[in-house]
């Protein structure tokens, strides 16, 4: 499943890594739910498992809060937790840039603040700017060669993602998840998103 503004779901000529004008984090979560409903209709006897990785892990966590009891199990891969001050600062910066350049503008500053520190764990001279994505260099090279990967995220997407992180981390929201659904939380031991396996 491609998220809105990503992969093959991106209309020709559209801005990549941008959910779309007026689209919110909740719009993307509702899109996941629409796919879920279609799968339930097409395969009513099969269990449905939700798996999300990286940004998809954050969207999946929002989904589990907003639509408890709709999936049979979930796998949350490469997820993390951000301090409120980090979220607040990111929202202020991305909001300021969006007011000047528009929400569909990409920002090297915001991208570097969001992902730049991830590569620092891999030495002073990483092989690529994306070494943090995988311990397997072939995976990193395939990612960098794929025209559907690696576009700079827009400030509009960053704002929505930060709002999603804040929503996910709100204790009252966490309590809304289905406590009987099996959920596997998993992260690589060198994954900076998951604090090097610490979560």
Segment roles from a protein language model:
Residues 43-54:
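Alpha/beta-hydrolase fold nucleophile elbow
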Residues 185-187:
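Short beta-strand/loop motif that positions the catalytic acidic residue
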Residues 60-148:
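Alpha/beta-hydrolase-fold enzymes
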Residues 52-62:
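Glycine-rich nucleophile elbow surrounding the catalytic serine of serine-hydrolase chemistry
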Residues 20-40:
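Alpha/beta-hydrolase active-site loop
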Residues 150, 189-199:
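Acidic catalytic loop of the alpha/beta-hydrolase fold
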Residues 153-175:
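Active-site nucleophile elbow and catalytic-triad environment of alpha/beta-hydrolase enzymes
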Residues 1-13:
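Conserved alpha/beta-hydrolase
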